[in-house]
């Protein structure tokens, strides 16, 4: 019996149990029963045991830790040991070592482009100016050093097609919801007196958290029993301190912040307990053309969604309807928005294939067939 070819999915920025790496790409590979799968990444807060998938942690600690510079060399050692047939790199930092290793290991290299890092660095303002210049150079160097060595690109967003026009060999595989929930008939908000709002995921300034909190506090003046839960990974220590200093004692607000990524299931369970999912993203050039995974997942769970005003997102929210898109900074409109939310009949149309991972899974599985058996 011939041995299954090995596949590696690797990241520095994402934990080994990252939603896309493990539950979407990883489970889609495992389902074929054709490959020996290894997922390499950041140390998870609680690493799960997953049947027939090997989870390999090659970094832990703060992202600013200098030991992170050694990760590409650890990655190279794993490549030499495993001798994969296919390597899927999901962060730019590992590309130079992948280029080098490919010369003598002859694997197929796929770059899963989950972010437009150059745009993120320019607009998300998560680092000082001098570091942004250095980071942009390193991204450009890593992604462009030997682009011809990349056999195929995966774009996690449709907008990357126009943002990266020089890339010709690509497949768009969007980050849709890999979860299912029994369909509920159309409903209205169940609790008009003490609604439970939630913000979950990666908690950063560009997520629009501050504007959403201030919006909620204004609503809380009229609805004193309302509450807002904020749960997730807060990677910027300065922002963590700001949130805890300014809002930890605020009426109706519950903070559950971590300096490490939290398991997706933990956040999802909290979202399911809430009445309204808030997605208050700032409309930056690095964000406005993307479709947040949280939007897909919120609709899959049939949650009421309150989201930043954006024509792209509004077209999705209005379809079912799943909620409303608003200007979170328009505090004066809080009462009228709440009245509109109470009067809406949600999910008159059932969440459909536009929301779920299933179609993306088939595209990904076909891509692997094309890459490993090109004839």
List PLM regions with ranges:
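A charged, aromatic-enriched C-terminal amphipathic alpha-helix characteristic of glycosyltransferases
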Residues: 329-336, 342-373
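Acidic anion/phosphate-binding donor-loop and adjacent secondary structure
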Residues: 165-167, 171-172, 176-194, 208
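Conserved donor-binding/catalytic core segment of Leloir-type glycosyltransferases
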Residues: 7-10, 188-220, 228-229, 361
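Nucleotide-sugar-dependent
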Residues: 207, 261-270, 275-297, 307-315
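A short, glycine/small-residue-rich beta-strand->loop->alpha-helix junction that serves as a flexible
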Residues: 9-24, 89, 204-210
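Nucleotide-activated donor-binding/catalytic signature segment of Leloir-type glycosyltransferases, i.e.
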Residues: 232, 241-269
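Membrane-proximal helix-turn-helix segments that form the acceptor-binding/catalytic region
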Residues: 27, 73-80, 96, 100-104, ...
């Amino acid at each position: 019996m011939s041995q299954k070819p090995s596949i590696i999915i690797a990241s520095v920025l994402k934990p080994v149990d990252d939603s896309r790496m493990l539950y979407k790409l990883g489970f889609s590979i495992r389902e074929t029963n054709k490959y020996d799968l290894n997922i390499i990444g950041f140390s998870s807060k609680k690493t799960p045991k997953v049947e027939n998938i090997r989870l390999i942690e090659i970094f832990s600690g703060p992202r600013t830790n200098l030991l992170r510079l050694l990760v590409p060399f650890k990655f190279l050692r794993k490549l030499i040991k495993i001798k994969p047939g296919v390597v899927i790199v999901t962060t730019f930092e590992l590309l130079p070592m992948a280029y080098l290793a490919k010369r003598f290991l002859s694997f197929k290299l796929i770059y899963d482009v989950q972010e437009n890092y150059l745009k993120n660095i320019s607009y998300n303002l998560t680092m000082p100016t001098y570091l942004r210049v250095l980071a942009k150079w390193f991204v450009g160097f890593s992604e462009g050093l030997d682009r011809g060595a990349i056999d195929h690109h995966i774009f996690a967003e449709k907008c990357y097609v126009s943002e990266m026009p020089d890339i010709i060999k690509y497949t768009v595989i969007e980050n849709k919801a890999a979860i299912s929930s029994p369909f509920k008939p159309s409903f209205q908000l169940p609790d008009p007196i003490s609604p439970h709002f939630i913000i979950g995921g990666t908690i950063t300034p560009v997520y629009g958290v501050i504007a959403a909190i201030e919006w909620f506090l204004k609503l809380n003046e009229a609805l004193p029993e309302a509450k807002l839960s904020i749960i997730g990974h807060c990677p910027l220590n300065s922002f963590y301190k700001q949130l805890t200093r300014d809002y930890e004692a605020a009426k109706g607000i519950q903070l559950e912040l971590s300096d490490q990524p939290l398991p997706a299931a933990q956040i999802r369970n909290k979202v399911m307990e809430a009445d309204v999912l808030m997605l208050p993203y700032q409309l930056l050039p690095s964000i406005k053309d993307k479709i947040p995974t949280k939007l897909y997942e919120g609709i899959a769970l049939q949650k009421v969604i309150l989201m930043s005003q954006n024509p792209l997102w509004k077209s999705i929210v209005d379809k079912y309807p799943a909620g409303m898109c608003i200007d979170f900074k328009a505090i004066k409109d809080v009462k009228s928005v709440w009245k509109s939310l109470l009067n809406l009949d949600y999910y008159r149309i059932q969440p459909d294939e536009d929301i779920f991972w299933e179609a993306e899974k088939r595209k990904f599985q076909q891509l692997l067939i094309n890459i490993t058996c090109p004839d």
